């Protein structure tokens, strides 16, 4: 009887691990957009934090270099926060009911 329960437990653990790996792949490929300056600068970033695209409104090309740099940094930071929130939300949904703390880093 115990062997059967252990086998079921192992199957369940393997299934959870497969689901987590799939979720991590989906998160890595998910893209978010961060912006600053009311949309004058937009950054597209994937779940690996790779910046895929930077859009700068032409009106900013007339501004001082420091303003442009500040807006770029703000847009990147906005995108990073959105990636992290997306990752946290997805993992919270995956681990709901398992008794795993929401910020627990999985080893796989």
Swiss-Prot record:
Keywords noted in UniProt: Cytoplasm, DNA-binding
Any one Gene Ontology cellular component term annotated for this protein: cytosol
Highest rank taxon of the organism: Bacteria
Primary location recorded for the protein, binned into one broad class: cytoplasm
Record protein name field: Nucleoid-associated protein HCH_02614
Family, as annotated: Belongs to the YbaB/EbfC family.
Gene3D superfamilies: Nucleoid-associated protein YbaB-like domain (3.30.1310.10)
Lineage start: Bacteria, Pseudomonadati, Pseudomonadota, Gammaproteobacteria, Oceanospirillales
Subunit structure: Homodimer.
InterPro entries, A to Z: YbaB-like_sf (IPR036894), YbaB/EbfC (IPR004401)
Molecular function in Gene Ontology: DNA binding
HAMAP family named among the record's database cross-references: DNA_YbaB_EbfC
Organism from which the protein derives: Hahella chejuensis (strain KCTC 2396)
Cellular compartment(s): Cytoplasm, Nucleoid
Biological function: Binds to DNA and alters its conformation. May be involved in regulation of gene expression, nucleoid organization and DNA protection.
């Amino acid at each position: 009887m115990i062997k059967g329960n252990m086998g079921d437990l192992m199957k369940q653990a393997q299934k959870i691990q497969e689901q987590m790996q799939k979720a991590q792949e989906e998160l890595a490929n998910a893209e978010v957009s961060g912006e600053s300056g009311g949309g004058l600068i937009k950054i597209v970033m994937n779940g690996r934090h790779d910046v895929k695209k930077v859009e700068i409104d032409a009106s900013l090309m007339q501004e001082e270099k420091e303003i442009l740099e500040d807006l770029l940094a703000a847009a990147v930071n906005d995108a990073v926060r959105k990636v992290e929130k997306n990752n946290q939300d997805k993992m919270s949904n995956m681990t709901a009911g398992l008794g795993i703390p929401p910020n627990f880093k999985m080893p796989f």
